[in-house]
């Protein structure tokens, strides 16, 4: 046990050294809440709330062993992406998660360094890195590891940095000492539910993608967006932060991220709607090459911008 305590301490220190803002550990198979979250996902899928995101149906999510055979521990990390600044132009809105460089690559590179450190301490250890593209219950395991709780808007909330937090996980065959799982403390607050213009949060923790502005601007591949979405878009052309903007845990002073690669791109802060309408595909591809927003194809950007101009 002494060895596992020492290794746990070293792994956590290494994770903080790499710049993560929240670090916690969960033991596999986890508490009964993991079963609860897995069952909740199944009900969400059965209701069709994933819309066209068929990858959400992957059965691999149901069993952590599908990700790494013999997994015993999970290191969960959170990386603050909040920047205390606003876009100059108010005629378009872009979700904060896409302001800097692609967070998937940033988190993966940092976790690789933690994994290599683990290898030096335990040469026989096997490991796997999971970011939010993996068939893995990332929010549930973040909650299990104690770095935050799942809010009613379905984002993970940390008491220090709110919900402006990217998640990453390092699965390992090594036994590490677990932290206490986080307990949801949203209480009776339903500000996120009340603020959503399309009522996409149909009940606490249940987001219907068919009604969600983020889904439609990021994932909907139709040539035109539904009229009921267009009428409620405001100026959102890439994602949506409304439910996070109103969350009380995001109202207190949150420090700006110190991660250089998460500082806002110049075009994100300064371009106007008219600027973006003049961009050809080559300009879009150049601007998006290091961004998580490259998931939105140039034609989708134009569709989204046209849509906010059509709203009644």
From Swiss-Prot:
Listed SUPFAM superfamilies: alpha-helical ferredoxin
Highest taxon, organism lineage: Bacteria
Cofactor binding, note field: Binds 2 [4Fe-4S] clusters per monomer.
Enzyme active site: 132
Assigned GO CC terms: cytoplasm
Cofactor: cob(II)alamin; [4Fe-4S] cluster
Keywords: 4Fe-4S, Cytoplasm, Iron, Iron-sulfur, Metal-binding, Oxidoreductase, Queuosine biosynthesis, Repeat, tRNA processing
Subunit structure: Monomer.
Purpose of the protein: Catalyzes the conversion of epoxyqueuosine (oQ) to queuosine (Q), which is a hypermodified base found in the wobble positions of tRNA(Asp), tRNA(Asn), tRNA(His) and tRNA(Tyr).
Protein name: Epoxyqueuosine reductase
